[in-house]
Amino acid sequence: MAQYDQLEDKDSLDIHDNPPAPENVVKEDDNTVYFVYDEEVEEEEAPPPPTPEPIVQVNDKPHKFKDHYCKKPKFCDVCARMIVLNNKFALRCKNCKTNIHHSCQSYVQFQRCFGKIPPGFRRAYSSPLYDQEINNPGQQNRTDPVFDTLRVGVIMANKERKKGSEDKKNMMMMMMEEEEAQQPKEDEEGAEGKQDGDKKDKTATDDKNKKQQQTFSQSHYYMALYRFKAIEKDDLDFHPGDRITVLDDSNEEWWRGKIGEKTGYLPMTYIIRVRAGERVYKVTRSFVGNREMGQITLKKDQIVVKKGEEVNGYLKVSTGRKLGFFPADLLHEL
């Protein structure tokens, strides 16, 4: 085996005996070797671009904050944390009523104040949702689309409500004048007793319509369920148990009613219709009912309408939204 290995070693060629010359080597006749390298080109560094001038943010409508004592727990419109300190002092905007901590004042210095907000649509315009306006100065002068939509909707609703009530009132006045003009004519024709067949049919139809109108007007009335304090000048102020005459029910939410000599608008959910023969009761003490037994829970001074006879000391009553049994000894008839 050793002989075969020696023969193989003689025939083999080692790369280290005659290594290949690299490409960048130049060899002359006197065995002088030169290495050739590419010339390095130094790249000139471009001067850095000039730094842009910082955008100076100007707030044309800043908040007007003043020290405010919070009698009730309030939440900061910036950090959404409760304003609870020993003295409960906070900063409150004079116009938009925004409440913030003293430490959060720097976060709203570039926010615009939206001014006074109509009652019923007060929103936190200085909440963190509006912090994006600080990063985008081009959109600082944009108004809130939700607020504009609500404001236009309220204005249009008030116009339609007043316009509909005026049209309804004019139509009722015209109908009353026509009925008054037709009534003496019918009396004279009835006294003479000389009417044709067509006139008799017409008179009978008119009398029937009048009887139906009288029956409809006397078939029900409306009773106040809750206390409603007038918000606007044309609203009707009433207390629970007041009897209300409805003049206009064309609107789905606000009706026009009358109590004595006072007229105005009222929310239709605050009243209940009472039909002829139904009795109205007032709750004298709060009671928690059992739903499994068909009982309802009512609070003191609530107004209910009787809907059934007494069974085992319980009356079936209705509040307009709920219907069930209630102890008869806790009800006082109005």
UniProtKB/Swiss-Prot annotation:
Tissue: Expressed in muscles at the muscle triad.
ZnF locations on chain (Phorbol-ester/DAG-type): 62-113
Alphabetized Gene3D superfamilies for the sequence: 3.30.60.20, SH3 Domains
Name of the encoding gene: stac3
Biased composition (Basic and acidic residues): 7-17, 191-210
Domain SH3: 217-276, 277-334
Protein name: SH3 and cysteine-rich domain-containing protein 3
Region listing for Disordered, in residue ranges: 1-26, 178-215
Function, as annotated: Required for normal excitation-contraction coupling in skeletal muscle and for normal muscle contraction in response to membrane depolarization. Required for normal Ca(2+) release from the sarcplasmic reticulum, which ultimately leads to muscle contraction. Probably functions via its effects on muscle calcium channels. Increases CACNA1S channel activity, in addition to its role in enhancing the expression of CACNA1S at the cell membrane. Has a redundant role in promoting the expression of the calcium channel CACNA1S at the cell membrane.
Gene Ontology biological process terms from the UniProt entry: positive regulation of protein localization to plasma membrane; positive regulation of voltage-gated calcium channel activity; regulation of release of sequestered calcium ion into cytosol by sarcoplasmic reticulum; skeletal muscle contraction; skeletal muscle tissue development; T-tubule organization
A GO CC term assigned to this protein in UniProt: cytoplasmic side of plasma membrane
Lineage of the species this protein comes from: Eukaryota, Metazoa, Chordata, Craniata, Vertebrata
Principal place of residence: cytoplasm
Membrane topology: Peripheral membrane protein
Any Pfam family the entry gives: SH3_1
Subunit-level organization: Component of a calcium channel complex with CACNA1S.
Keyword field contains Repeat: yes
UniProt source species: Danio rerio
Keywords tagged on the record: Cell membrane, Cytoplasm, Membrane, Metal-binding, Repeat, SH3 domain, Zinc, Zinc-finger
Gene ablation phenotype (knockout): The mutants mi34 that do not express the protein exhibit altered motor behavior most probably due to a defect in the coupling between the electrophysiological activation and the muscular response. The nervous system, the neuromuscular junction or the skeletal muscles seem normal.
